[in-house]
Structures are given as C-alpha cells and as structure tokens.
Amino acid sequence: MIADKDGTILCVLAGRWRYAISQAQIEHFGLIDPVDAPIDQRGHPLICRHLATLLGDAEVLAPGRHHAMTVVLRRRSVALLVNHIDNLDGTGPYEIHPLSPLITRRLTLPWFLGAIIYQDAPLLLLDLHRIATDVAIGAV
C-alpha cells in the first residue's frame, strides 16, 4: 500500500525515538504550551498529551512550548506534543509495509498502521487518529 497519494509522510521525534506519521491525520501543526489551557477551534479545551509518554518513553519534555499535532475528533480535539516534526528527506510516496502478525499480537495498543523504510531503516507509522481517540475517551 502506498502512504498517501501525494506522499505526505512526516517524521516526528517523540522522546528518544523517531516515528512516521501521515500528514492527512493532522488538522493543525503548531507550538503549544499545555499550561496555558489552550482551546480548539470550537472553543473546547484542547486535550494535550506528550506522545513519547503515551508510547512508553520515560523521557519527559521540559515545561514550555512544544511542537504539537492537533487531531480533530467528532467532539474533542487532541494535541499530541513531540520534540520535533520534520519532512522526510528523499523521494515519496513511501510504501507502507504491514507489521507481521507476530509483532501485531504483542502490541499493547493497536496504534501502528505499519512501517516505512527510510534511510535503510524501518520507521513505525503511527495511527494518530486512534491514539487521539484513546486519549479522548480516557483509555490511556
């Protein structure tokens, strides 16, 4: 399967690890300080969570403004905070490789769409909509 028709796969640094994301799942990119109690475009409080913490990385971002990816759900919006967001250097579109059943069965949460090969190494492709949904319903 090809990632997006226009190849909009980005790389995020969340804690110590890099992941691939689909730009199509993001409503807005920006800088957010969660202490400021940000609101979404509908005037509701924006739910802010550190993506690295959700993915099991113990490294915590320092207080202050962080790169944020806002995912809009039906009733709420979730801002996933990361260390850095960047374009992938190279040619797209990228082919999404499914995760093997062995790996998929061992995942605690089904937050990965597959993997792409970038600079001869795999990058896990995150399902940001699924992550945001789990955050919004309080599952994590």
Regions found by a protein language model. Give the residues of each.
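An acidic, low-aromatic, low-complexity terminal/linker signal
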Residues: 1-140
